[in-house]
């Protein structure tokens, strides 16, 4: 990597935490089962199309942020090596991001907004790990074609070049989206390269648009390119076994579908059900040589730390250990947080810390990349990212199985025991 000797100031440190009240229609994603909670600092834009599931949002003040657009970093350049205020114990995290993530902006009120990256970056900087800030590189055309079709890529590029437009009622392309999507798709690859080069022990990709809903030839759920899948496919091509843990509140239908028949990628998902996008049933276990490598643990709305810890202790961690991945990718969505307006779940920051700690122990705190997915309350995103990095780097207490198991987890254990040694 080249050192960027005059690092640009990526983000203002100040954040406005004023709160606006929001109402969600019961038909949001057709499955919202919990009332919306307060959402921190959302910009006021034009109204969304009348068919959008987002049409009921009423947003307040924006979070001020700025990025040095006039001084764009070279791909893969280190912006700064910022040791924490605390003893980081030698644990280094590559924080991979790019200014283009702030340029992907919706033409209507939208929860998937640039300030999410601001919050994630600030959360990473507040962690006790040593942060190595790295500029994402673009994913190459061949890296994208390992996941998406040529026609689909052409369509995204053409639509962006023409100024953008809606792909569906919730997913959009702007004039800057194609560039942002290429850098977002390359962020996980950049983190892998930083770890390979010895610059970091693990990585966190704070980029957008998110990716886990994107299919081979279809954008959906705010996602354009499947960032985690692009990274996984590149690792598989070099002979690695890859595991993907997806703790976003929504099932990662795109990631599961892209590797549904592959024995080289293990996909494990905890998610709200029934909920958007309607996939992720326990019985979706993969097919062909990949039978058993799709592991779904749907949980009812309102589930919190107890249910997630049960899922990790009884399903995620045992299967991860038996699979023995060379690399772990985490679709790190934070819309499962109790304060998130979309996820309908009840996690708090310490739950993300516990889950990340268990993964850190499982992976010996290396060869792991977290990639930002959902999460629409800025304060919750910031606090949860801090907790995630601290948990992975320093967490020492393994997740313990609750005395009484969650019945939804019981069902997952019963099904997945056909392929894995679970009790």
What residue spans do the PLM features occupy?
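A general "terminal functional-core" signal
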Residues: 87, 92-95, 155-423
